[in-house]
Amino acid sequence: DISGGDLDNTILPYLDYERIASVKKQFCGYSDLTTIINAIYAKTQKVPVLYPIRNLLYEYSAQQKEDFIKTCFAKDLNNIINNDAVKMMEKNNLYDLSVENSGLYQFPYKFYQGKTVEGIVVGGNIRCFLKIAGTEYFQDVKDKILLLEARSGNTAQIVTYFAQIEQLGVFKKVKGIFIGTFTKMKSKKQVLT
């Protein structure tokens, strides 16, 4: 069982990266699967999808499913469905297959520097991301966008994780940083300064 992110790095040597690279599917996951997601990218250059699949099961799941399909499979859908039919549906605003209009990209955010960022997102759960630091499973972060989040961890733990990322030189290499939710700190109203 690799749930909770505690043991996921123990299976990395046993994954068949050549086979993963050859399959025409994307690996989807989030948080607890951070180690595996980043290892797959480092070893195959195949960009995984950082997405909490559980969203497809909860409240607003119908909308989440539609947004997920539009975002991840729009190209495949356009190839499968008669293009004239797709154009007609889009023209009549019945179904928009453009990724830019996907609800997956509609969330509140705030820029602290600059006004836009575009690129490949790496990272995920900060603790799980750091478990692969210094290994062959840690990808080149140059010009990537770093996503960091955590469910657990008090302020001291999170500060330590950020310090380690800084000491690895990651912050100087990435072109952007997404700070996600740090759930335990948020619930206790703790703030990083």
Regions found by a protein language model. Give the residues of each.
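Structural motif
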Residues: D1, C28, I145-E149, F178
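N-terminal small/polar loop signature for handling phosphorylated ligands or for N-terminal nucleophile
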Residues: D1-V23
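Short glycine-rich anion-binding loops that position phosphate/pyrophosphate groups of nucleotides
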Residues: G4-D6, G153, F182-T183
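Short, acidic/small-residue loops that bind anionic groups at enzyme active sites
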Residues: L15-I40, V47-R54
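Conserved anion/nucleotide-ligand pocket segment
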Residues: V47-R127
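Oxyanion-binding "anion nests"
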Residues: I120-I158
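C-terminal active-site/capping subdomain that shapes the small-molecule cofactor and substrate pocket
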Residues: Q157-T193
